[in-house]
């Protein structure tokens, strides 16, 4: 499985570089959307070196990857460090054994500590832990215990994600529990509120939607300097207008359009065998989309946006403000003549605020099945 898949990804990269007008200059690489440390170090080396062969590397670059605490070895960490990777994130989720059994992810704290310590010993400059609230059987004590345990390792960043319960999707691993075992909306809200307060108490700063960082981390500095950006992989300290996603179901972003690869492995292979870039669907942004995108990014990255400049104005702004009027009454945001500022209380509703700007979503809302609760 490993070698054929790496071969396929490198073939896809070749197809892209064959049609690009110039040799690509890589500023960022993120290995994720899954756990690349399931691959042997030798295969990861072949993948990254194969990518490097057809590109130049920017002097100031940032390479990161996602690691599973149970199968990330020191060999993985050393190899990727030698290839230029300096940031790693580990999927911790929750330290409660009952919760871990329900989500089929048993991983003791000792494994998280081992890979965190090893990354720092090797020289990684940023280690992140991904925590999740709203998991089946999860209690407030579980959330606080998980935060406190991770805090003993002092990761540079902590992502505090909401669990998305999508029971109508089959085969997604969410089957070690019943629907009633998942915390209700009100309980889930409490888990988030108390968890956020604990993170702030122990010295982490809120830097964006679901993300917290120590003041010494580059992500925090980017937030303070209004240089934070967000893409499909999450927050980043640099902005690039072209992001090429490689692999099954990967998403690419050229700023003016999105494209997604085949989600089925056989279909992905078949397209590559025909020397076709395996994109199965996409969307070209129109001028209105581009303006809306900038407002949503401003809100997600800085909790404020303005339409004082003509290039940030659009016809439906009054409709958006009407949608947000109730939130202003509730103290979640302030609306001035040509600007919105999200309050501290409103930060946890940032997804809802951004949804008011998503005109395409508003237009199809009556027929849309909301994928999961925003919190």
PLM-predicted stretches and their roles:
Residues 2-19, 25-314, 374:
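C-terminal scaffold of the Radical SAM
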Residues 99, 224, 339-357:
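Short, cationic-aromatic polyanion-contact patches
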Residues 278, 304-305, 333, 363-366:
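Intrinsically disordered or highly flexible coil/loop and linker segments, enriched in small
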Residues 294, 302, 324-326, 330:
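Flexible mid-to-C-terminal extensions adjoining Fe-S/redox cofactors in radical SAM and related proteins
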Residues 300-302, 336-338, 345:
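Short, loop-centered acidic/histidine patches that primarily coordinate divalent metals
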Residues 314-328:
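Short amphipathic alpha-helical interaction segments
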Residues 328-338:
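A short, conserved structural fragment
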Residues 347-375:
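Short, amphipathic alpha-helical interaction segments positioned at domain boundaries
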């Amino acid at each position: 499985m490993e070698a054929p898949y790496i071969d396929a990804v490198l073939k896809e990269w070749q197809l892209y570089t064959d049609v690009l007008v110039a040799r690509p200059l890589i500023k960022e690489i993120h290995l994720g959307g899954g756990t690349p440390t399931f691959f042997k170090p030798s295969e990861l080396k072949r993948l990254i070196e194969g990518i490097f062969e057809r590109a130049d590397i920017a002097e100031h670059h940032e390479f990161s990857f996602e690691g599973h605490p149970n199968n990330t070895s020191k060999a993985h960490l050393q190899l990727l460090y030698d290839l230029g990777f300096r940031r790693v994130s580990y999927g911790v989720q929750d330290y409660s054994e009952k919760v871990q059994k329900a989500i089929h992810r048993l991983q003791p704290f000792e494994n998280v500590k081992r890979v965190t310590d090893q990354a720092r010993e090797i020289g990684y400059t940023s280690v992140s832990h991904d925590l999740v609230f709203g998991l089946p059987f999860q209690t407030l004590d579980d959330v606080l215990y998980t935060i406190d345990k991770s805090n003993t390792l002092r990761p540079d960043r902590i992502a505090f994600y909401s669990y998305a319960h999508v029971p109508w999707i089959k085969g997604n691993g969410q089957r070690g529990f019943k629907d009633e075992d998942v915390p209700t909306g009100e309980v889930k809200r409490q888990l988030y509120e108390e968890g956020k307060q604990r993170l702030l108490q122990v010295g982490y700063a809120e830097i964006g939607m679901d993300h917290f960082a120590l003041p010494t981390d580059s992500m925090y500095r980017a937030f303070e300097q209004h240089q934070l950006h967000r893409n499909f992989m999450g927050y980043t300290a640099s902005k690039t207008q072209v992001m090429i996603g490689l692999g099954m179901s990967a998403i690419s972003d050229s700023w003016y359009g999105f494209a997604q690869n085949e989600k089925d492995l056989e279909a992905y292979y078949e397209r590559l065998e025909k020397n076709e870039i395996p994109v199965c669907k996409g969307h070209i942004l129109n001028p209105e989309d581009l303006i809306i995108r900038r407002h949503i990014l401003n809100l997600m990255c800085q909790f404020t946006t303005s339409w004082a400049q003509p290039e940030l104005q659009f016809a439906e702004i009054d409709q958006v403000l009407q949608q947000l009027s109730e939130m202003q009454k509730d103290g979640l945001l302030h609306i001035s003549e040509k600007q919105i500022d999200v309050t501290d209380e409103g930060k946890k509703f940032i997804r809802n605020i951004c949804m008011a700007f998503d005109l395409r979503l508003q237009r199809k809302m009556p027929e849309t099945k909301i994928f999961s609760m925003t919190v």
